[in-house]
Amino acid sequence: SHISEFPVGTYKKAHRHGPGAHLVLLSGTGGYSLVWTQEDRSDMIKCDWQLGSMVVVPSDNCFHQHFNSGTNRARYLALRSGDMGLNSPHGGGGEYADRSMKEGGWQIEYEDEEREIHEIFEKDLKAHGATCRMKAFIPWCTGEVGPTSERET
């Protein structure tokens, strides 16, 4: 288990791991998670969240990504099974969780994500009256430079 916090107008990298991760939103005024299993994201769903919401990652092959489109910092508690929920029937364990897909890992780097992902985010930010702060990582971002270290997102 761990707690993660991220500023307004930022989001985490898309990733996957073993099933059974549960996220409980501890603070924040709005945001969402995207969840999909198909490479073309044809089955992608947007799960809006608010304070007290729970997001459940349903399966091993499920990519997911978390976005803070609200007006306050967002914090969530990630709960996983005893094996940290990182072991995968596809092989490997937690060492793949923070490794790029290009290196055989389970994480999609910002520069490799589909433009659609960021466009959805900017649309949601606009609806909440917030500004995107991902310009340091996303070349087509129409917002501003915010965090410059991935650890700050």
Specify the residue positions occupied by each region the protein language model found.
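Extracellular structured ligand-interaction cores
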Residues: 1, 19-20, 30, 63, ...
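A short beta-strand-loop-beta hairpin characteristic of the jelly-roll/cupin
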Residues: 16, 22-51, 62
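Conserved metal-binding segment of the jelly-roll/cupin
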Residues: 47-70, 79-82
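Double-stranded beta-helix
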Residues: 67-152
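Short, glycine-/Ser/Thr-/acidic-enriched flexible segments
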Residues: 8, 29-30, 62, 81-84
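A short glycine-rich, His/Asp/Glu-containing loop-to-beta-strand
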Residues: 1-14, 19-20
